[in-house]
Amino acid sequence: MFLMEKLLERVNYILEALPYITQYSGKTVVIKYGGAAMAKADLKESFAKDIVLLKYVGIHPVIVHGGGPEINRLLDNLKIPTEFVHGHRVTDNQTMEIVEMVLTGKVNKQIVSLINSQGGKAVGISGKDGNLAKATKAPIEIELEGKEKQLFDVGLVGKIESVNPEILHNLQKAGFIPVISPVAENSEGESLNINADTFAGEIAGALKAEKLILLTDTQGILIDNQLVTGLNRNKVKDYIRKGEISGGMIPKVECCLTAIDQGVRRTHIIDGRVSHSILIEIFTDQGIGSLIES
């Protein structure tokens, strides 16, 4: 009897997913992959299995990835000094060569191989391939003590100006899973390093994705150390204004707002340290992390 109860419990888990499979089949979900989920072997495997399962039930995942720790490791090994200004890496020509080599040549291909090893058909590209994205240099705004805010040039760091999703549509139609490295060109043909969260938001908007999911190393958006499970634009802006959303969480929530402005229905900031967090978010009634919607 106990065995039968356990089997029925498993069946109920599958049945819980059924309405969500029906709802999202044929739809695009953009996932920003980074943090601990990229570093730990068990989490990497669970991520790859999640992505392959999504594809097999008719959902179209598109992956945008980071890779900061790998970049730092190679720069250290090559004894290339790294300068940061207010948390932003100053990226000269030499550093950009390393960034592109690591992101597009190493990390991207590792993710492709990981997904393919679980039965998927992943293809790795960057923003430069198929004219996917065009970018422009993006100086940062800093405030020095006793002075007004001013722009500071951090080198070959960019923001997305436009996205042409044709290559992604073609890959999806052919049954492939696009894996995108956050490197794009400007009008002068220079390679620029793009914040992966920001890039994911722009990709989601261009594809009119059903969902944007950001994997992070936190439960979601925490206010007074409590997880906030649901927010809208006004609430996010209010938390930023009060300083309750700050630091590295700001570009994450802002990319969610950008995606929403471009037609993405739901955006999620979830804990990538939790095994199978993507499946928990998409296929369970409770979900996981923080939801931001219009």
Curated annotation (Swiss-Prot):
Its EC number is 2.7.2.8. It catalyses: N-acetyl-L-glutamate + ATP = N-acetyl-L-glutamyl 5-phosphate + ADP. The keyword Nucleotidyltransferase does not apply. Pfam families: AA_kinase. PANTHER family: N-ACETYLGLUTAMATE SYNTHASE (PTHR23342), N-ACETYLGLUTAMATE SYNTHASE, MITOCHONDRIAL (PTHR23342:SF0). Pathway: Amino-acid biosynthesis; L-arginine biosynthesis; N(2)-acetyl-L-ornithine from L-glutamate: step 2/4. Substrate binds at residues 67-68, 89, 193. Belongs to the acetylglutamate kinase family. ArgB subfamily. It is found in: Cytoplasm. Its main location: cytoplasm. It comes from Leptospira interrogans serogroup Icterohaemorrhagiae serovar Lai (strain 56601). Catalyzes the ATP-dependent phosphorylation of N-acetyl-L-glutamate. This is Acetylglutamate kinase. The keyword Transferase applies.
